[in-house]
Amino acid sequence: MNVFGKKEEKQEKVYSLQNGFPYSHHPYASQYSRPDGPILLQDFHLLENIASFDRERVPERVVHAKGGGCRLEFELTDSLSDITYAAPYQNVGYKCPGLVRFSTVGGESGTPDTARDPRGVSFKFYTEWGNHDWVFNNTPVFFLRDAIKFPVFIHSQKRDPQSHLNQFQDTTIYWDYLTLNPESIHQITYMFGDRGTPASWASMNAYSGHSFIMVNKEGKDTYVQFHVLSDTGFETLTGDKAAELSGSHPDYNQAKLFTQLQNGEKPKFNCYVQTMTPEQATKFRYSVNDLTKIWPHKEFPLRKFGTITLTENVDNYFQEIEQVAFSPTNTCIPGIKPSNDSVLQARLFSYPDTQRHRLGANYQQLPVNRPRNLGCPYSKGDSQYTAEQCPFKAVNFQRDGPMSYYNFGPEPNYISSLPNQTLKFKNEDNDEVSDKFKGIVLDEVTEVSVRKQEQDQIRNEHIVDAKINQYYYVYGISPLDFEQPRALYEKVYNDEQKKLFVHNVVCHACKIKDPKVKKRVTQYFGLLNEDLGKVIAECLGVPWEPVDLEGYAKTWSIASAN
């Protein structure tokens, strides 16, 4: 499948300069003033190569730096038209090409891909209506629920600011942060089981974690969470095996997927949503906007809607995997809205912003990020996935900047009334095209529009959240935060899995340098299960001094929700 419309060239390949003209000398020969003399400034072939080499690296991702990926195909097997008017979810049998990138979260690009860490699983679907992204993880929950904590949390997962050692040598700051922010306990309980070390990228699941809101043509809201489940089932490595591979084969997962696809295998995933009405959300035991909680499947069963098939390796890692840019803003296409999840709201800004820093202001014009319906002349080729198959040409008023590949040619950069410059606007449900924003907007038209928006907002907020003013708020910790991870440890993990969980925690926490933090780790797990805390204390060689949640919060100055 040729996503980018690239023609298969059969012409001879000639070594050339960047301007396209052939270079007649040996590529390895520099130009000297005389044999064994100094090189000449006029050797522009040498200068061009050195200058290019000096600029080869772009900043690596601040998170999810280590990764790999491939091309894919999405197919809609079951319509979601009853809960959303989003175009890709309407017609059974709809297919589109795409790209997926798998990654770890905390490590740099050279770290092992079998490390105990969540896995990022990000999808980009090249639909006829534009690019649609899913930016997921392989865990259904996360370490935090307030966006303000995300930068400092990531700092704690990186290298120590003084020693510059990472958590393979020193885990003090890692556990210091987690135990002072115990809403992390659900993610930690998940991650320090063998679920934290998947056997391969093709045999692990992916979850949105966040709640999104799907809207149907009647304007009815439905909360959803996405699940992408491996067709072969979830397979894991033991902690010891993952650690061994970290040393012997740090690119294990990347190599395994590349080999699978090279050998003709096509791993498959099944796509589901959980759905929750706003009325159900009011009765739900937890907040629908809490990223540290799951929706129980008994109450909110999975509903299948599609499949994803991994189809082939990319042609060039840097061009298609390193330069690909995902964002949850691309999840929120017409028919899908973001929820009030604080972390999701912040990601809507952070993801595009970090790509502008990493790749440049025009990163969405790069071939791997360019929408099919952009109408860019450089997208044309013999592919079935070019702009000609799209229902409309995408146009906006964003112009210029560094490395602008496609600047919309003669299209005006404002709403114009000039001949042959007609610009149409689609309604929210994508059914109608009109000139509704042409000309002068009267006050009464604005007032009607604002009143309708306010009514919709008040209606939705009344159902789930009371209408609130702005205020500063610290999420407290409460017994509710331990219910789901306790059930995971006590009811889902069998005896052998519990032993492995203790082993994994102790092997990691034994690298803590500060005795106070090491002691707090035992109390942290003691809040989950007292016997668990006691066993970990014995294994770490620290006194077991159990405390209840209130005592823990007071001792370590943690905000309590009580």
UniProtKB/Swiss-Prot annotation:
It comes from the Eukaryota. Keywords: Cytoplasm, Heme, Hydrogen peroxide, Iron, Metal-binding, Oxidoreductase, Peroxidase. SMART domains: Catalase (SM01060). One of its GO terms (cellular component) is mitochondrion. InterPro entries: Catalase (IPR018028), Catalase_AS (IPR024708), Catalase_clade1/3 (IPR024711), Catalase_core (IPR011614), Catalase_haem_BS (IPR002226), Catalase_immune_responsive (IPR010582), Catalase_sf (IPR020835). Homotetramer. Belongs to the catalase family. This is Catalase T. It comes from Saccharomyces cerevisiae (strain ATCC 204508 / S288c). The gene is CTT1.
